[in-house]
């Protein structure tokens, strides 16, 4: 019987990455970010442990979607009160709270348990081009979301 390798938690190196979301496709960007948060890009990935890195997303207000999703994709939230369902299109939510779009997409790609909540805290999303995490010396991460494109 094979045993699952357990890396010592103190030996884990947690890197910080910064991702520019300008003109990136939302779903493809979110899936790459979720893989980094989980640590699936590392050799010592363990499914039930937090082995991932921190990710900073800048320019979330410039994220792109294809087709008619800008006007037809709906985001729903509920206040908890009777009749409290609110519905908003992608375009309106992008004007009001652009960070929430990226957060919602990434959160849906993480595990639905306490580990997923812990992983989600390592995601930092900002609408503009600046972020307050310069002290962590984040590395630039270029994610290609358009198949066949070089940018």
Curated annotation (Swiss-Prot):
Biological process annotations from GO: negative regulation of translation; translation
Protein name as annotated: Large ribosomal subunit protein uL13
Membrane-crossing residue ranges in chain numbering: none
Keyword match Ribosomal protein: yes
GO molecular function list: mRNA binding; structural constituent of ribosome
Known function: This protein is one of the early assembly proteins of the 50S ribosomal subunit, although it is not seen to bind rRNA by itself. It is important during the early stages of 50S assembly.
Record's keyword terms, sorted: Ribonucleoprotein, Ribosomal protein
Coiled-coil annotated spans: none
GO cellular-component term (any): cytosolic large ribosomal subunit
Family, as annotated: Belongs to the universal ribosomal protein uL13 family.
UniProt source species: Nostoc sp. (strain PCC 7120 / SAG 25.82 / UTEX 2576)
